[in-house]
From Swiss-Prot:
Keyword terms of this UniProt record: Cytoplasm, Hydrolase, Nuclease, Ribosome biogenesis
Gene3D superfamilies: YqgF/RNase H-like domain (3.30.420.140)
Protein name, entry field: Putative pre-16S rRNA nuclease
Cellular component GO terms held in the UniProt record: cytosol
Amino acid sequence: MSRILAIDYGKKRTGVAVTDVLQIIANGLTTVPTHQLLDFILKYVEKEPVERIIVGHPKQMNNQESENMRNIVPFVNQLRKKIPDIPVEFVDERFTSVLAHQAMLDGGLKKKDRQNKALVDEISATIILQSYLESKKYI
C-alpha cells in the first residue's frame, strides 16, 4: 500500500504528517518553510509511494473559509498540476491547533517546548490526517 500525506498549510511554516504504509497510524513527519513546500513534496513522492494528499481546510466557526484559503488554493492547484496522478483533498481543520496544544499538555511537554510553533504545525497536520483516517473507517 501507499502512504497518505497531510499538510497543515501556513503562511510561514507548514506541518507535514504521513501514514504508515498500512494507512493505520498518522505520524508527524516535519515542518517545512512554506516557500519550500512544493519542492519538499515533489522529492518526498519520488522516494515514497503516496496515494493521496490531504490539505487542512481552514474554516471559521460560521463555516466560512478563513483568509488563508487565498494562499492554499493556488498552492493546491500548483500541486495538482505537478503531480496529477495523486489526488488532493481538503479536510476541515477547525480546532486542530487547539487539539495540538492540548496534546502537548497531555504529553507533559514543558512550556518552552509548547511554544515551538513548528512542533504545533506538525502535530496539527498529524491530527488532520488521523481524523481523515478515522472518518474513512466508518464509510
